[in-house]
UniProtKB/Swiss-Prot annotation:
GO cellular component: cytosolic large ribosomal subunit
Family as reported in the entry's similarity comment: Belongs to the universal ribosomal protein uL13 family.
Name listed for the protein in its UniProt record: Large ribosomal subunit protein uL13
Record lineage: Bacteria, Pseudomonadati, Pseudomonadota, Gammaproteobacteria, Pasteurellales
Membrane-spanning parts: none
Molecular functions per Gene Ontology: mRNA binding; structural constituent of ribosome
Length: 142
C-alpha cells in the first residue's frame, strides 16, 4: 500500500464559523491553528495546505485566565528609533480585538510561505456579524 499524498488542486476546503464568546484564548487558538493546518483530516500532508477556512465572530468576548487581562503585554515596534510600543490584553481588546486572536493563532502556525497561506484562511471579526454568508459556513463548536 502506498502512502497517500494530498495535491493542492484536489484538497476540499470547508468553511466554518466559530463563536469566541467566553472561550479561553489559548485553547481556542490551538484548535483554530490545528484546523487551519488540516491536521484534523485523514488526508493531512505536511507540505500541502489541507486546512479549512475559519470565521471567528465575537472576538471581543474572548476570555483569558488568571491575571492575564492586566499582566499579558503585547509588544510591537514602529520602525523608528525608540519606537517600541506596548499594550495590555485589556487595551488590545478595546483597541483591536481581532488582533488578539490573530497574534495567538499566527504564532502557532508554521513560519514561511505555507504558514502565511494557512493564516490567510482565518477571518476574525470583533462583533457578531461577518460578510461570508455566501460561503454557507457550518457552525463549529470548540
Amino acid at each position: 500500500m502506498k502512502t497517500f499524498v494530498a495535491k493542492p488542486e484536489t484538497v476540499k476546503r470547508d468553511w466554518y464559523v466559530v463563536d469566541a464568546t467566553g472561550k479561553t484564548l489559548g485553547r481556542l487558538a490551538t484548535e483554530l491553528a490545528r484546523r487551519l493546518r488540516g491536521k484534523h483530516k485523514a488526508e493531512y500532508t505536511p507540505h500541502v495546505d489541507t486546512g479549512d477556512y475559519i470565521i471567528v465572530i465575537n472576538a471581543e468576548k474572548v476570555a483569558v485566565t488568571g491575571k492575564k487581562e492586566t499582566d499579558k503585554i503585547y509588544y510591537w515596534h514602529t520602525g523608528y528609533v525608540g519606537g517600541i510600543k506596548d499594550a495590555t490584553f485589556k487595551e488590545m481588546i478595546a483597541r483591536r480585538p481581532e488582533a488578539v486572536i490573530e497574534i495567538a493563532v499566527k504564532g502557532m502556525l508554521p513560519k514561511g510561505p505555507l504558514g502565511r497561506a494557512m493564516f490567510r484562511k482565518l477571518k476574525v471579526y470583533a462583533g457578531n456579524e461577518h460578510n461570508h454568508a455566501a460561503q454557507q459556513p457550518q457552525v463549529l463548536d470548540i
